[in-house]
């Protein structure tokens, strides 16, 4: 099954400047189940508000556990993590 993971931050001015960015990136890159990742922006298209991932996994619980172990979450940078099952119909990247 595929899952969308939305990780929201209260104040996240520059993920690349965050000291744990390398650890966060390596954590998600090492996952064989991460299909896509992206930064999340506010409606203004400029203000960074978090991250978005599409993952393949056996269960919702597996994705939640993986997301909770993200170095950014362990450092309390994420205010809220939301995981939803998705059914991709069209991809035009």
PLM features: residue spans?
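Conserved, structured core segments of small domains
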Residues: 1-93
């Amino acid at each position: 099954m595929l899952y969308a993971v939305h990780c929201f931050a209260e104040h996240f001015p520059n993920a690349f400047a965050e000291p744990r960015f390398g650890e966060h990136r390596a954590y998600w890159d090492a996952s064989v189940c991460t299909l896509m990742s992206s930064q999340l922006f506010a409606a203004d298209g400029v203000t960074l508000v978090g991250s978005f991932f599409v993952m393949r996994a056996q269960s919702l619980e597996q994705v939640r556990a993986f997301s909770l172990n993200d170095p950014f979450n362990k450092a309390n940078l994420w205010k809220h993590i939301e995981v939803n099952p998705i059914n991709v119909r069209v991809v035009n990247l």
